[in-house]
Design a protein with these regions (language model features):
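C-terminal regulatory/effector modules of DNA-binding transcriptional regulators
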Residues: 188-232
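Exposed, interaction-prone assembly regions rather than primary DNA-binding/catalytic cores
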Residues: 107-205
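Short acidic, hydrophobic short linear motifs in intrinsically disordered regions
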Residues: 39-49
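Short helix-capping/hinge SLiMs at alpha-helix to coil transitions
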Residues: 34-38
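Short amphipathic alpha-helical interaction segments
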Residues: 50-65
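Accessory beta->alpha helical hairpin/"wing" motif in late/C-terminal subdomains of nucleic-acid enzymes
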Residues: 71-97
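Short alpha-helical segments that sit at the start of domains
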Residues: 4-30, 110-121
C-alpha cells in the first residue's frame, strides 16, 4: 500500500447548502462514497484517506453540520452512516455508482443495529478503503460488469479487480446457496483468484459448507464460464 502522507490536507471544496453539489475529487466525497458502499464506516478508514487528525475533525463537523452524515453509537461501537440527505446528494452526483447500494432495502441502504451485522459492515469499510488505497477499483462504474449475464473478454481490462459479494449476487437464483458466505468479495489478479475475508479483532462464525459452495461457484462461473484459460 502507498505510504501515508503527512502534513495538512487541503479543505474540502463543496457547499451543499448553497449548490447541492460537491467536488468529486474531495476527501469529503471519498469518505461519503465509502460510507455508501459499506453501509456504516469505521473510524479506522481515516488513515487510508490520508486524513490528519485536525483535518478529520473539521471534515466530520462540516459533514454533520450539513446534515450529510450521522454518528451511530450502540453497544459501545461508534460508526458513521449517511443521512437521507447524504444519500440523495450522492445519487444526484453519480447514480451509476450508488444506485445499487442506496435505492432498496439492502443492508448498505438500511443498515441494522445489531452488533454482529454492524461489525461486518465496518470491517467491510476498512477492506474497501485498503483496496482503494492500493489502487484497486471498488466502485461499479470503474470496472466491467462481470455478473451482468453478458460474456466478458478478459483481454480488454486490466487486473487486479475487486467485486463485492453484493455484486456477484446479481446472478440471481444461482447465488442463493452462498448467501450466508462470510466473504467480503473476490479479488481477481493476473495469477490467481482470491476470496477475501476480514475478521478484524472479532471471530467469524463460519458456515463451512457455504464457503465450499462458494469455491465451487467461483470455479464454475469465473474459471470456466467467464474466463476460460485465465485461471488454471
Amino acid at each position: 500500500l502507498p505510504e501515508f502522507q503527512s502534513g495538512m490536507v487541503k479543505s474540502a471544496h463543496y457547499n451543499y447548502k448553497k449548490e447541492n453539489s460537491m467536488d468529486t475529487s474531495s476527501k469529503a466525497y471519498k469518505l461519503l462514497s465509502l460510507i455508501a458502499i459499506s453501509g456504516e464506516c469505521s473510524k479506522e478508514i481515516y488513515p487510508f484517506l490520508y486524513l490528519t487528525d485536525s483535518y478529520n475533525e473539521k471534515l466530520m463537523t462540516r459533514l454533520k453540520s450539513d446534515g450529510l452524515i450521522k454518528i451511530h453509537y450502540k453497544d459501545k461501537l461508534r460508526g458513521i452512516r449517511l443521512t437521507r440527505r447524504g444519500k440523495d446528494l450522492l445519487l444526484s452526483l453519480s447514480p451509476e455508482r450508488f444506485s445499487n447500494n442506496l435505492t432498496d432495502n439492502s443492508e448498505t441502504n438500511r443498515p441494522r443495529s445489531d452488533l454482529p451485522r454492524r461489525l461486518r459492515l465496518q470491517q467491510a469499510s476498512i477492506a474497501y478503503a485498503m483496496l482503494q488505497c492500493a489502487g484497486i477499483p471498488v466502485y461499479p462504474e470503474e470496472k466491467p460488469a462481470l455478473f451482468s449475464g453478458n460474456p466478458q473478454d478478459s483481454a480488454k481490462f486490466a487486473l487486479p479487480l475487486f467485486y463485492t459479494a453484493r455484486e456477484w449476487k446479481e446472478l440471481g437464483a444461482e447465488t442463493i446457496k452462498i448467501n450466508n458466505s462470510r466473504s467480503l468479495g473476490i479479488l481477481l489478479c493476473e495469477d490467481a483468484l482470491y476470496v477475501l475475508y476480514f475478521t478484524g479483532d472479532h471471530p467469524i462464525k463460519w458456515e463451512y459448507r457455504t464457503e465450499l459452495r462458494l469455491k465451487a461457484f467461483l470455479n464454475y462461473h469465473l474459471k470456466q464460464d467467464m474466463f476460460p484459460g485465465l485461471y488454471q
